[in-house]
Amino acid sequence: MIVGVPREMSAGERRVSLVPSAVQVLVKAGLEVLVEAGAGEAAGYPDPAFVARGAALVSREDVFARADIVLQVRGPGAGTGAAAADLAMYRPGQVVIAMHDPLGAPEMVKELAARGVTAFSLELVPRITRAQSMDVLSSMATVAGYQAVLVAAETLPQLFPMLMTAAGTLAPAKVFVVGVGVAGLQAIATAKRLGAVVEAYDVRPAVKDQVLSVGAKFVEFDLETEGAEDKG
């Protein structure tokens, strides 16, 4: 069986669907891995790193023409611009594992089905223990929460931590996080580490303990929340 890894074509996309260490695992399992030249460059994985782990470097056309399973970060539905052009290269019987955004781009999914392609949409994998290793949303949400605070810290015209100097004292920044899912919790933790005073709110009262556990204050409002879920 052949696994193919094409370079991501969506504007601004720097991720790669398979890293060199994972290539080695697949090769040891008896699979052949084809990687488009330059697929991992933007993510910090040069071509020699893939070759050293057993992958073969090929053209984009060869990846789609030869691979039984195509691994992508964004499928044609979730991609933008040039990524949608990949649609014409999928062939009947091929399996595509990626984030496809089937609810946002149902026409793309219908086109894949019409071509006889089997598509697995990773963002729809349920958040259960058995599927934890395939939970792409939680890992990306963690990065998003972290990055959001870094952007805020760079944009805010004051420093995050309290600083005491001979010239006086600078009060810490106050951060308010709305929504305490995976991204929210990471944002809280990052802001706290940078020295800010952090408060957070979520419609789910059950997350109060999680907020307190990362050192923030949970803000409560007198709202009807009986129907709120207890998971983020």
Regions inferred by a protein language model and the residue ranges of each:
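Glycine-rich phosphate/diphosphate-binding loop of Rossmann-like nucleotide-binding domains
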Residues: P6-A42, P161-G232
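Short hydrophobic/aromatic-enriched beta-strand-loop microsegments
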Residues: L57, V95-A98, T118-L122, V198-A200, ...
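Short, charged, surface-exposed secondary-structure boundary motifs
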Residues: A67-D68, P106-M108, T129-S133, Q210-V211, ...
